[in-house]
Amino acid sequence: DAFYACREQDYPKDHHEDWDYLVEKFDFQANQDSDFVLKNSRPAISAEEFKGQGVDAKWIVYGDFLGDQKCSILRLIVEPGGKTKFCPESPALFHTNGGSGRVGKLDVRYHHDMILGEIYPEIGFITQAALSKGGVEIENTGTEPLVLTFDFPQHAHSKTPGI
């Protein structure tokens, strides 16, 4: 059900399955802006709070647009043998874009030749429960850099990175 993937404050439970409510809330004009990236993207900026020995991090932020903090991405690169404790402000979805390693208890590995219908260990979540316990350890167990991309939801940061 699509409504369960939405934030409660955006789509209260009493409006689940209410497609008219969804259509009223949706900003069609903003979603059809063919120049969105040109108007809102910024160069990647260093994420000093997540850098360390053998660990590089960069924010990819589209800033505040339409008067609101909408999205941000953190690219984390852990060199072979490196590890770091990761505890961002907000839960996040992550994708493995290169290498292999461990995120918390989850073994992750990037796959070059994916087959539709197969399950691959390259996508996961950093949950609020994990953050409440101090975050997760990320370790590169492979021979090439472990590249992870964390997607943060809107309003994930107390201050939009780089703004």
Task: Give residue ranges: language-model regions.
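Ordered hydrophobic segments in well-structured contexts
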Residues: I73-R75, A92-H95, G124-I126, V147-T149
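Ligand-binding loop in jelly-roll beta-barrel domains
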Residues: L106-R109, G117-S158
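Compositionally biased, intrinsically disordered low-complexity regions
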Residues: G54-D56, F65, V103, I126, ...
